[in-house]
């Protein structure tokens, strides 16, 4: 991947988030979230809007980047997985007829081969009329690559 980029996003396009103190973690839920403790964070600048398909397309055009959803999976990383599960794709939201058991995400998310930021509902769908919609099907690694190209970084917990 080339990191040819337009340079840092100008500060006049960002909003300032003031620093402060917050309570991080929890003592009441999962052990790995504890112990709860106070954390001081410095102020920072943040993009006030979601990244659009248009902006993400500019990044992909400039770098040749392929998202996680566009890359096939390596069978060696998933021994015994059926080959049809190793094709590029992503999970697509499926509207339910009513309330469902939230412990079973397959009731409202469907693995869709070919779904990606370019094809949000899978093959046959496109972003042609959605240039200014928020980009979807972007993994953390994809967001990191976009942020680095834009001269920024992703926010962290603290």
Q: Where are the regions that the model predicts?
A:
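Extended beta-strand/loop cores of jelly-roll/beta-sandwich
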Residues: 1-158
């Amino acid at each position: 991947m080339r990191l040819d980029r337009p340079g840092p996003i100008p500060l006049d396009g960002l909003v300032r988030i003031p620093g402060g103190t917050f309570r991080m973690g929890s003592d009441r839920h999962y052990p790995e979230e504890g112990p709860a403790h106070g954390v001081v964070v410095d102020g920072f600048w943040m993009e006030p809007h979601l990244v659009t398909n248009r902006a993400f397309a500019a990044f992909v055009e400039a770098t040749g980047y392929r998202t996680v959803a566009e890359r096939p999976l390596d069978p060696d990383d998933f021994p015994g997985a059926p080959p049809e599960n190793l094709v590029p794709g992503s999970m697509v939201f499926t509207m339910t007829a009513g309330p469902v058991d939230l412990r079973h995400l397959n009731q409202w998310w469907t693995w869709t081969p070919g779904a990606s930021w370019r094809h949000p509902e899978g093959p046959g769908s496109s972003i042609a009329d959605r240039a200014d919609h928020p980009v979807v099907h972007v993994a953390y690694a994809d967001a990191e690559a976009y942020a680095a190209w834009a001269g920024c970084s992703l926010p962290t917990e603290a």
